[in-house]
Amino acid sequence: MKKTMGLIALLILMMGLVGCSGETVNIDFPFEVGDVENIEVYRYAGVPVSAEKKVVVAATDIANLYDRFEDLSLKEKQVEEITGADVTSFRFNLSDGTNYELIYVCNGVKNGKLKSFTGNFEYFTSSDIGSYWFDIDLEAVPAEESELPKQPD
């Protein structure tokens, strides 16, 4: 009986420690989906000079991307970025003339960082945000490095 109680207490303690390993958060956009005129999506593997761009203008596609980001599970966790990572960026162009940028850096399978300097956050995610690029059925065109959402040094 004492062994069982000790084992139960140990399990409860371990579950509590695992639960404290990182609080899950969600993106709370400071704008509504109806405020988005278009979304510029950029992707490159390794070096920015290889960047490509797609521009999402259909209201249903904009709403789909907006909802996918709001439903993401993110955690405050430090992740080391690797050189030559795949980067997928999103620029939400809003009807008031401003924009909101998201940058996803894939550091491996189920290991990525989503950051926004306009939103002032940086989170870990195990979601494959890079796959959003392939889900957008639009033609990709070459993008200039100067067009890409900026990451401060």
Residue ranges and their predicted role:
Residues 15-19:
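C-terminal motif of bacterial Sec signal peptides marking the signal peptidase cleavage site
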Residues 20-153:
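Function-determining sites in protein domains
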Residues 1-6:
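Positively charged n-region of N-terminal signal peptides that target proteins for export
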Residues 11-12:
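Repetitive helical segments and hydrophobic/amphipathic motifs
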